């Protein structure tokens, strides 16, 4: 892996991340393909209509179904899906946290029940990496101890201490694999925890950086119930503690506004189900704000979703047609709406990158907000 930082404009960064399955210009938004598939889309959409250099798969879900060992027999995620570009896999800790009421955390790992059949499973830091090796992920996330917010201070303290110990176990396990000539193209990211507490974020960041050579650092435990202002403040004081020569990934975030504010605070990578989930539910993102395509007001609207969008959907179809497809329950709506929302997100970060490279980031950010709420949406 190679990470080259080209330009910093304020704290916003433009860089290139080189991985085994292609280069990734940052800032970057990564579409979420939980089940090794971005919902409603195929590879032609991802490669041609959206041009995504990296997508996410989820360790928890793929371990349970179809099984990581089965995927390994079929050539890992790339052989299994035939998607030729990069995969990042989450550790599954968030799903164990969010999908199961009977999850138990211990020093060994996370015990959880399958949401599919109720069977019990144990995720340890080492087990998670073994799964991710089977998936042959380009970027692997370590297992972390996630806490929902608000949470007692003692629970957050326990979380960062356990996350650090698990990260150390992950790093030692990964280094042992590399010493045997294995896992040479699987790159490991640590995850900073600490809630919205400045002291805890500093402790977590410095502890993880001090462990050794992680390939990148994620900021986890945000967008889990705290106000946006607290999330932005947390990013403001967390990113300076992370190495400048390593990529920074804000997990599970978020709205276009969240992404703009995180880029402004030095974050490079993002993922979220929002663009595809909102698309399926009738909410489309535009340069002028959100648009509810289910509204009767669009029944005779011949305009594209967004006059400034270059996506396949906006080039070929009107708001009226999308309104009809949604209200009729047509499956084609899900594809066309998802193409648009993901293209909007990818164009948002591409525009940010161009602005940073030309040192006009402040103006790009200003223009982003100036257009929000205009009548067009």
Swiss-Prot record:
Top-level EC class as recorded in UniProt: transferase
- Keywords for this protein: Glycosyltransferase, Metal-binding, Queuosine biosynthesis, Transferase, tRNA processing, Zinc
Catalysed reaction(s)? 7-aminomethyl-7-carbaguanine + guanosine(34) in tRNA = 7-aminomethyl-7-carbaguanosine(34) in tRNA + guanine
Q: Does the keyword Glycosyltransferase apply?
A: yes
What is any one GO biological process for this UniProt entry?
A: queuosine biosynthetic process
Note how many cofactor molecules are bound and how. Binds 1 zinc ion per subunit.
**Signal peptide residues on this chain, from the entry's feature table:** none
Chain segments annotated as coiled-coil in the UniProt record: none
Give the protein family: Belongs to the queuine tRNA-ribosyltransferase family.
Q: What is the purpose of this protein?
A: Catalyzes the base-exchange of a guanine (G) residue with the queuine precursor 7-aminomethyl-7-deazaguanine (PreQ1) at position 34 (anticodon wobble position) in tRNAs with GU(N) anticodons (tRNA-Asp, -Asn, -His and -Tyr). Catalysis occurs through a double-displacement mechanism. The nucleophile active site attacks the C1' of nucleotide 34 to detach the guanine base from the RNA, forming a covalent enzyme-RNA intermediate. The proton acceptor active site deprotonates the incoming PreQ1, allowing a nucleophilic attack on the C1' of the ribose to form the product.
Query: By what name is this protein known?
Result: Queuine tRNA-ribosyltransferase
User: Where does this protein come from, organism-wise?
Assistant: Wolinella succinogenes (strain ATCC 29543 / DSM 1740 / CCUG 13145 / JCM 31913 / LMG 7466 / NCTC 11488 / FDC 602W) (Vibrio succinogenes)
């Amino acid at each position: 892996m190679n990470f080259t930082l080209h330009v910093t404009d304020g704290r916003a960064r433009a860089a290139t991340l080189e991985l085994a399955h292609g280069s990734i210009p940052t800032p970057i938004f990564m579409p979420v393909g939980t089940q090794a598939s971005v919902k409603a889309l195929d590879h032609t959409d991802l490669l041609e209509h959206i041009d995504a250099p990296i997508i996410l798969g989820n360790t928890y879900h793929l371990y349970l179904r179809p099984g990581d060992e089965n995927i390994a027999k079929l050539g890992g995620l790339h052989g299994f899906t035939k998607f030729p570009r990069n995969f990042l896999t989450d550790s599954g800790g968030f799903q164990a946290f969010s999908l199961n009421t009977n999850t138990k955390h211990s020093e060994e790992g996370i015990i959880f029940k399958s949401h599919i059949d109720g069977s019990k499973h144990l995720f340890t830091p080492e087990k998670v990496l073994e799964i991710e090796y089977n998936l042959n992920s380009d970027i692997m996330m370590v297992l972390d101890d996630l806490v929902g917010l608000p949470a007692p201070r003692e629970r957050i303290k326990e979380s960062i201490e356990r996350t650090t110990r698990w990260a150390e176990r992950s790093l030692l396990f990964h280094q042992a694999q590399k010493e045997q000539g294995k896992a040479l193209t699987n790159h490991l990211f640590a995850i900073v925890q600490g809630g919205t507490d400045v002291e805890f974020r500093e402790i977590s960041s410095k502890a993880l950086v001090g462990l050794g050579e992680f390939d990148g650092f994620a900021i986890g435990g945000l967008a889990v119930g705290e106000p946006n202002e607290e999330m932005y403040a947390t990013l403001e004081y967390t990113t300076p503690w992370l190495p400048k020569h390593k990529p920074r990934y804000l997990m599970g975030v978020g709205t276009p506004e969240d992404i703009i504010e995180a880029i402004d605070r030095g974050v490079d990578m993002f993922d979220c189900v929002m663009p595809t989930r909102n698309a399926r539910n009738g909410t489309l993102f535009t340069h002028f704000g959100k648009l509810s395509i289910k509204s009767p007001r669009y029944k005779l609207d011949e305009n594209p979703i967004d006059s400034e969008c270059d996506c396949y959907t906006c080039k070929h179809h009107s708001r009226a047609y999308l309104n009809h497809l949604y209200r009729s329950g047509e499956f084609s709506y899900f594809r066309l709406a998802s193409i648009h929302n993901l293209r909007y997100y990818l164009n948002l970060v591409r525009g940010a990158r161009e602005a940073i490279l030309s040192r006009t980031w402040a103006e790009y950010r200003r223009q982003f907000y100036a257009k929000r709420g205009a009548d067009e949406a």
